[in-house]
Regions:
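Conserved metal-phosphate-binding beta-hairpin within the catalytic cores
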Residues: 168, 343-370
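Conserved catalytic alpha/beta cores of large enzymes that bind or transform nucleotide phosphates
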Residues: 244-347, 354, 396-400, 421, ...
């Protein structure tokens, strides 16, 4: 919309539209504009004038490409708010209330904040302001239809600044029709500067109440009630990883996310590969989306109403993949613009809406992300549970912290006084104005909501662990019950019974002594990948896909390929439910496996990620849904039908083809070419050749697109014939557990022989030394990915002395082993050179 300067003529017919304004008369058809600024005339330099939210919208509307749509509208300046207080002489009385009230007293805070809001809400607006609001609304209506529906949003002058989000503190009004209703909404927005939550937040952040003013933004409503809407972050909200665009969405209006009422869909897009032209969604998580917020009829008492979402829409994503990619590109463009303007990287928090009638995607808000952006990236804090206990229930983790204490069930805001210091606040959902009670809590659990709702954002800012989407929490947990809330394991948060001790370790990565040998990490859970990737490691030495198959896919791949062969009708029904929304069972398997592997590969991009193809034993395969119809019972599965032998056997070769297709999709289609594929438990040279042939037939040809294929060196034949295996593969990874088992003839699962299972036995060490030397003879790398180097410093030192190329460790062992190895290597250099003795110390 063009900026309208100066005076605007008003005709007699427009008086009805504008309403009854005392200063407006037929003989004076001109109204001077003082308080209105059209959005596309604003920039970020106008924050003191129109607040952070409105200035940001103006920046988007006026400075970015036409690909980014911003709904037309105008801002009512912060001067209008200040003049309202001054013209009604409100501030002296308000200041007295603000000064004399104990804002930590919940009852007094609620009473006095309501009193402050009432003072503003009942004060008459300046007649000039009233007229200008109506006139601007008329102009907007002329462009888009009589009595156009508008969104009315507060925009504080201290809002959306680094370290200050003000998330959800001030009022928003949707689907506002008519000039009179708009004027009332503006008045309520001004009053919302003094909600209990807003007052408390300003006190905590050190803002003087008089220094913060409120502007109001008015925009044409996007008909997201007929489509979808949501939130975008240009980083991973839990780890702060900046290679990710995270998009959440629900059907209908975005308030369902903001209020934590609906469990949203969540989509991840990888920035570096998208920039290279790989337009693929990294990961889809489909939320339940059981309810949606839609516009009510114009005659209704409330402007919006909640509706149930049908089952078919609950399981369907609220955005198509091409729309997800389009939003990701827009978010990246916005981030780039703000970063260039600010002269520093500026991750963004963005709200989007899809218009039902025209299908277009709009950006309705954009602001700097305020939680991770200000943090020192060189500091790494790890939270570790030092014990265990029975898991009561699970949900989505917000943050990575751990908290424990007695449960305090809260039905609504009237019960917040019950929440004491150190309590675990449990509710169906929370709202941002619960912040004073949230501050007293050691953790929060809700039955609904997603990781981008306002309550989650505020909880991150407060440093409180939160679990959202924990179904039945208010039924399963009782007030006074002691529990531990664990968010340290990735996206899945756990509520455990009892008080379980935990430890916190913070290290400055820049000051760590680094080992000369590459340290890598073992990982299985994609949900933990972005957090683990913050460790100072050279990459992933072992990515186990068994976790993805067990927890994400859940079904035996052959059962997905041949569901008609499943004898149990109940299992057939479960598999049908799992695969609904996918083209076929094979499409389900390939998609879910590819997304899990891709998440790990993206987290560590461009570092190498060695992905081992499935290495379940037959009894483990049988435990998957439908598995018993495709697996034979074995007396000793540990050395039975596992690893490479399965891949070329008629009973499993079609399933292995699906694994290959998933890995090919990750590397070639999604652009994550840092994935190295590794074959486990390959007994014979002929078997290796047949496996490589099968891989090539399914898109994984060694050397194509830089593909490297490694082999696990975990069978004596791998060491004895290492010169032959070296001709077929690009690298080796020693599996010390299986190698020890097979060299010593000790069943690694046998309790009675546990004392004889010894990785540092001379026979095992001799095999490891031969393997390293054999790989190096052919110019190939040889690493190790067993547990022993984590537990035994002497063994790790011995490996380094044998010039092992890499040691892959569990994430919680990395920093300790790194520092021990660095000290050892430094000490070794200061001593005369000698061969290290084998030690189990």
């Amino acid at each position: 919309m063009p900026v309208v300067q100066g005076l605007i003529p008003i005709n007699a017919e427009q008086i009805f539209e504008i309403g009854n304004c005392p200063r407006l008369a037929l003989e004076n058809h001109m109204v001077e504009k003082n308080y209105i600024r059209w959005l596309d005339s604003l920039t970020l330099d106008d924050i003191p004038l129109v607040g952070g939210k409105n200035a940001s919208l103006g920046e988007l509307a006026g400075s970015l490409t036409s690909d980014i749509r911003v709904a037309e509208g105008f801002a009512i300046t912060a001067a209008a708010y200040r003049d309202l207080l001054e013209s009604n002489a409100l501030w002296p009385g308000m200041e007295q209330i603000l000064t004399n009230t104990d804002w930590s007293d919940m009852e007094a805070a609620a009473r006095e904040s309501e009193r402050l809001r009432k003072m503003i809400a009942t004060a008459p607006l300046l007649s000039e302001l009233d007229a200008e609001i109506r006139q601007a609304y008329l102009k907007l209506s002329q462009d888009h239809g009589r009595n156009i529906a508008v969104a009315v949003r507060s925009s504080a002058t201290a809002e959306d600044l680094p370290g200050a989000s003000f998330a959800g503190q001030h009022e928003t009004f949707l689907n506002v029709h008519g000039a009179q209703n708009l004027v009332e909404a503006v008045r309520k927005c001004f009053a919302s500067l003094f909600t209990q939550r807003a007052i408390s937040y300003r006190i905590n952040k050190g803002f003087d109440h008089q220094d913060v003013a409120l502007s109001v933004g008015v925009q044409r409503m996007i008909r997201a009630d007929r489509a979808s809407s949501g939130v975008i972050f240009t980083l991973d909200t839990e780890s702060g990883n900046r290679d990710i665009v995270m998009i959440t969405g629900v059907w209908g209006l975005g308030e369902a996310i903001v209020q934590g009422i609906a469990d949203p869909d969540e989509f991840l897009v990888h920035k570096p590969t998208l920039k290279l032209g790989h337009e693929h969604v990294l990961r889809h998580h489909i939320g339940s989306k059981e309810v949606k917020l839609v516009y009510a009829a114009a005659s209704a008492d409330e402007p919006t109403v909640w509706r149930k979402v049908g089952r078919s829409d609950q399981v369907k994503p609220c955005l198509a993949d091409d729309e997800i990619i389009r939003l990701a590109k827009q978010a990246m463009a916005i981030e780039t613009h703000y970063s260039e303007r600010n002269g520093r990287p500026t991750p963004m928090d963005i709200e989007w809406a899809k218009d039902g009638p025209d299908g277009a995607l709009y950006i309705v808000q954009a602001r700097p992300e305020t939680i991770h952006a200000p943090l020192d990236a060189g500091l790494l804090t790890q939270y570790h549970l030092d014990g265990d206990g029975p898991v009561i229930l699970e949900g989505q983790a917000v943050g990575d912290r751990i908290g424990s204490g007695p449960v305090r069930l809260v039905k609504d805001g009237s019960e917040l006084e019950k929440v004491g210091s150190g309590d675990i606040l449990v509710a169906t959902a929370t709202t941002p104005d619960w912040e004073p009670a949230m501050k007293r809590s050691s953790a929060i659990i809700t039955e609904h909501g997603g990781r981008t709702c306002h309550a989650a954002i505020v909880a991150r800012e407060l440093g409180i662990p939160v679990i959202v989407g924990a179904s039945d929490a208010t039924r399963l947990l009782k007030s006074g019950q002691e529990v531990t809330v664990d968010c340290s394991q990735g996206m899945t948060g756990r509520i455990l019974n009892g008080i379980i001790p935990h430890s916190v370790h913070t290290v400055d990565i820049g000051k760590l002594e680094k080992a000369e040998t590459d340290l890598m990490v073992n990982i299985a859970n994609p949900n933990a990948a972005f957090r683990v990737a913050a460790l100072p490691v050279a990459g992933v030495g072992l990515a186990r896909i068994e976790f993805i198959i067990t927890n994400e896919i859940k079904a035996h791949p052959m059962a997905l390929l041949s569901p008609d062969q499943i004898t149990d009708r109940g299992i057939r029904k479960k598999i049908a439910m799992l695969t609904s929304g996918y083209d076929s069972g094979s499409d389900y398997f390939v998609t879910r496996l590819a997304e899990g592997v891709a998440t790990i590969a993206a987290a560590f991009y461009l570092r190498p990620v060695i992905v081992r193809t499935s290495d379940f034993k037959s009894n483990e395969y049988a435990s998957l849904l439908g598995g018993r119809d495709f697996e034979q019972a074995e007396n000793n599965p540990m050395i039975g039908f596992r690893g490479a032998s399965r891949y070329v056997h008629p009973a499993y070769q079609d399933a292995f083809a699906l694994e290959c297709q998933a890995l090919q999709r990750v590397r070639d289609d999604m652009g994550l070419s840092n994935v190295i594929v590794m074959i486990p438990f390959c007994r014979r040279i002929d078997e290796a050749k047949r496996v490589l042939q099968a891989m090539a037939q399914n898109g994984l040809e060694r050397g194509r697109n830089g593909l490297e294929i490694y082999i696990m060196c975990e069978i004596p034949s791998n060491v004895v014939l290492i010169d032959e295996f070296a001709k077929l593969f690009d690298g080796f990874s020693i599996g010390s557990n299986d190698l020890t088992q097979l060299v010593l003839g000790v069943d690694r699962d046998s309790e009675i022989l546990a004392a004889d299972f010894e990785e540092e036995d001379p026979a095992v060490l001799a095999m490891i030394e031969q393997a390293i030397a054999g790989a190096h003879r052919h110019g190939l790398k040889c690493g190790i990915c067993g547990q022993a180097p984590s537990d035994r410093p002497g063994f790790a030192n011995w490996l380094v002395a044998r010039q092992i190329d890499s040691i892959s460790l569990s994430p919680d062992s990395v920093l300790g082993v790194m520092q021990r190895l660095a000290r050892h290597q430094k000490s070794a250099k200061s001593r005369p050179s000698r061969r290290l003795a084998i030690s189990a110390s």
